[in-house]
Amino acid sequence: MTVDSQPADGTDDFKFFGLGGCNEVGRSCHIIEYKNKVIMLDAGVHPGLQGLSSLPFYDEYDLSKVDILLVSHFHLDHAASLPYVMQHTNFNGRVFMTHATKAIYRWLLSDFVKVTSIGGGSDARLNNSDPNANTGSSNLYTDDDLMRSFDRIETIDYHSTIELDGIRFTAYHAGHVLGACMYFIEIGGLKVLFTGDYSSEEDRHLQVAEVPPIKPDILITESTFGTATHEPRLEKETRMTNIIHSTLLKGGRILMPVFALGRAQELLLILEEYWSLNDDLQNINIYYASSLARKCMAVYQTYTNIMNDSIRLTTSATNSSKKQNPFQFKFIKSIKNLDKFQDFGPCVVVASPGMLQNGVSRELLERWAPDPKNAVIMTGYSVEGTMAKDLLTEPHTIQSAMNSDMTIPRRLSIEEISFAAHVDFQQNASFIEKVNPSKIILVHGESNPMGRLKSALLSKYASRKGTEQEVKVFNPRNCDEVTIGIKGLKVAKVLGTLAEEQLSYLKKEISTQIKKDNVKIEELSDDNMDKETMPESDEKADKESEDTKNDIDKNNDENANEKNIISTGKALSGVLVSKDFDLNLLQLQDLHEFTQLSTSIVKSKINLKINADISLMKWHLEQMFGFISILADDEETWECVIMDMIDISVEKNNSQSAGGLLINVEWVNDNLMADSLADSVIAILYSIDSSPASVKLTSKSCSHSHNKVKEEVDDDAMIESTPPPEKNAHANSEISSRIHRITSLLKAQFGDSLKTAAGEEGKKATIVIGKNEAKIDYLNLTVDCNSRVLRDRIENIIKRGCGLAAPLSQYEKTT
């Protein structure tokens, strides 16, 4: 397990788990996890292994957790185990690939079932190194499994974005083969780019790999050729055609093992063009020996619209003489039956499979190997453990695929000219630099080339180490887990009525600020005009004009800062809705419009009885909350509302018969404040009976005297039982009382520096600290001071003082 960094507060872990294709080429399959979303990338087989051992390590991961499976292209090492995953595991996710990939997938895997030893069919030409292996029972899946999986596959267009349950992914051209794509994946703000196999080199029919317009955080890229550098395309083509030409003139035969689809079509285009330019070769046949390639040629003829500009212009030309399909060959024929193939003279055969494990290419190799006039040209990447890889060592003998006890002398020449549509080091490094990720995970490469590529990349970005731009490179092995801590910023969108209120508020603030700016600019301009009317030299006038401009710029900068202060830090209250990692802040009434959520109103009601009268109850409520709004007060009902949230009602007739007040308290449970306020009201009502204040308010002095007790007069005891006055001390705090409390706070902060203005009856005050003087107007609650720091400090104290001095609920203003 590789850990990039220890998880910290506010971070989520991104996890990469390689089930195949890590430190190897073949059976590509990778799992990425983030925020409980799981994506599988490719599902291939290893071309050098047989049966279940050729599969990725599916038993090491719970495939039922996978939400989406994305297939980059149709090659067997990326797609051949897909039917097995979909039909023989607990995988329940959705599968996506491009239209062209799906069109070829059906034919390719049908041929795979028949031809390989895994299929075990009657037509299979087997290459089983183990004579005791039970090929008939080693089927990974059947044709029926293949067709059922085919029906479940969904397609995606290039440059289109699909969003499913919080996962967004977009397909981009990857080059490599027809239909190949790289996926740009977004999960909860994290951006991941999976290149699959890709090519940045232009060829005859495919578009080069695209660079996505958005920078990914994590790049998962191939490392097939490590730090190797490709020979230029034109030089490769010239070298290949020269070898073919010279071999044919000597009477030899050329075998070109290829994958049935992909590079085969590119090589056929090269040969078709070369034959058209050389009349001496036009009587020599070119064959492509693959029933699969023949079936899929119609797909290539159909999907010319996703090929490069040259192909698209040729196929869409308005002039019928120029319009042609480049895949309708003139000099190339297909071989339908190898048993009837007559190979007595020189010829060129493009045959599959490319790894020479079995099939037509292996049979022709064994047939032509003893003749030194013949040649085999290896045009693709050769995987470890295959005949193609062994052949590059130029062995003296090769083993027969049909009879493992028989060896065949090898005298034909072997040439390696790689037309594999994979990036070399320069192309890979250039692409990485363009997308500029901070984390790179290398896949699809043998251990040594991958290790060299990792070292080269770390050396290239060594100057960034220890900085925020540091680039980290990982090269995990199969079944290794890479964990990367991702720290993201959560941003919520304000929608609906709440957004309209905020826009209105911002417009008002901006409009006010613009007016202030214009006034200041006009004042400065007027001052400048007054100065210019005086007789002065041109030099002095220019200087003052420049000073005026600087003053305006300075004031504009200050005003800009004030705007920032005004527009930030404002608290918003609403319902935060989270869906697919998107956060939206709404008011309750907007939920139905912007979400699929339904809303209900829950109203609480409680009945209680107290031994007191209405006036005493009202007095206690006013002492706590200040103002209470009386809705009804007649012979039958008394009702009030506290802070527009708590409704209290009393049925007077029922209360008289019950010997106390029967009180009904109701409130809507739509926020925490309402529930807290209701708890406070109920607590006050229940405590009225036993409150010492209630005893004092309702007690009377005796009308007679007690001789044995010294008669004393208690002011509290003199309070009559008549209802307390409407305007009690707390509910109707006088302005002077509030000013006194605010002044006390300022006094505690500034001491003797606080002076009350003479003759203003405490309505104004000044604070002098050093050279800075602040003038305070208590009635308007304004502070005038040339020091912003001092002014902000005083305003903050006044703001807190107002909150402390004011009751919870204010009296309604009357006009």
UniProtKB/Swiss-Prot annotation:
Gene3D superfamilies: 3.40.50.10890, Ribonuclease Z/Hydroxyacylglutathione hydrolase-like (3.60.15.10). One of its GO terms (biological process) is mRNA processing. GO terms for cellular component: mRNA cleavage and polyadenylation specificity factor complex. The keyword Zinc applies. Its main location: nucleus. The keyword Ion transport does not apply. Zn(2+) 2 binds at residues 77-78, 197, 444. Disulfide bonds: none annotated. Keywords: Endonuclease, Hydrolase, Metal-binding, mRNA processing, Nuclease, Nucleus, Zinc. Pfam families: Beta-Casp, CPSF73-100_C, Lactamase_B, RMMBL. Its EC number is 3.1.27.-. GO terms for molecular function: 5'-3' RNA exonuclease activity; metal ion binding; RNA binding; RNA endonuclease activity. Zn(2+) 1 binds at residues 73, 75, 176, 197. Residues 521-560 are annotated as: Disordered. Signal peptide: none annotated. The active site is at residue 422. It is found in: Nucleus. Component of the cleavage factor I (CF I) involved in pre-mRNA 3'-end processing. Belongs to the metallo-beta-lactamase superfamily. RNA-metabolizing metallo-beta-lactamase-like family. CPSF2/YSH1 subfamily. This is Endoribonuclease YSH1. The lineage of its organism: Eukaryota, Fungi, Dikarya, Ascomycota, Saccharomycotina. The gene is YSH1.
